[in-house]
Amino acid sequence: MNKVALPPTQPLPDAQAWQGAMSDVGLDWVGMQGIALPLELAGKPLMAKVNAGINLRASRHGARGIHMSRLYLTLDELTQGELTPQRIADSLRAFLASQPEHSDSASLSISGELMLSRPALLSAHRGWKAYPLKIDASLTTGLTLSLTVGVPYSSTCPSSAALSRQLAQQQFQFDFEQAPDKVSQQQVIDWLGEQGMPGTPHSQRSWAWVTVTLNEGEAELPVVNLIDRIEHALGTPLQTLVKRQDEQAFALANGQNLMFCEDAARRLYRMLRSQCHHRAFSLRVEHQESLHAHNAVAELSWQEAGNAA
């Protein structure tokens, strides 16, 4: 390859600083998407993808573009310890400080999957489960910070359960119609164990997506606490390692927590209002149907009076 002679003292051209033909047209957001960063959240590693950007103000003498490398360099601060609201806010302020002549608004989006070790329902085993999450932060006159988590769970259809119980009743009547008054307890027990479920209710893997707007001054991102509360409210979180005793306990949990998507959404609403005390929240539940070729979905949102989040 031919060598190129570069004058050692000549400054490098900065094309971004040149005034473009339409530099009087501002841009709402300019930045980078899909930046890979190794972060730490809740004391655990998080292989994250980050979107980072700022606005570009309109000006007759404005710049053609922003210096994205300055934003990239400031992101390294996020990797230096536990991811906290303060660390995120500091990064956003550094975005604005890196090019104050062009911008007065900065934003950051962090997404990934947090791995948590979860115990089995009864046996002395544990397994790992991945929880998708997203953190959205913006800084203009103040900091706005929201946390979204996805929690998988099982849902058994109440209507299908009722239809299945009716089938069991009908089958029992048919099998013992010859001598209904002479059926012993042991016969009933044997029948239930061998033929007591002529039909089974349908259930499906389901997802709860919950977004909360954090209060000012929160020291930590309450991701594990939020996941735990969602799972407790629903009662049927998906399992990891399962032995037969755990599977039976899971069947019992599903039977005791029959849910339409509307029921699941209302359970989460009551939990978030009574236990979490965030400025605002929204939620979406998806029952990925095993009966239908479509999903059953319910959505709900709330914000405290006077909050514009």
UniProtKB/Swiss-Prot annotation:
Keywords: Hydrolase
Listed EC numbers: 3.5.4.16
Catalytic activity reported: GTP + H2O = 7,8-dihydroneopterin 3'-triphosphate + formate + H(+)
Example of a GO biological process term: tetrahydrofolate biosynthetic process
Stored Gene3D superfamilies: Urate Oxidase
Residue stretches in coiled coil: none
Site description May be catalytically important, residues in chain: C157
Pathway(s) where this gene product acts: Cofactor biosynthesis; 7,8-dihydroneopterin triphosphate biosynthesis; 7,8-dihydroneopterin triphosphate from GTP: step 1/1
GO molecular function list: GTP cyclohydrolase I activity
Pfam families on file: GCHY-1 (PF02649)
Enzyme type, top EC level: hydrolase
Signal sequence range: none
Record keyword Hydrolase present: yes
Entry's family note: Belongs to the GTP cyclohydrolase IV family.
Function: Converts GTP to 7,8-dihydroneopterin triphosphate.
Stored NCBIfam families: PRK13674.1-1
Name of the molecule in the record: GTP cyclohydrolase FolE2
Species, as recorded: Serratia proteamaculans (strain 568)
Gene name as annotated: folE2
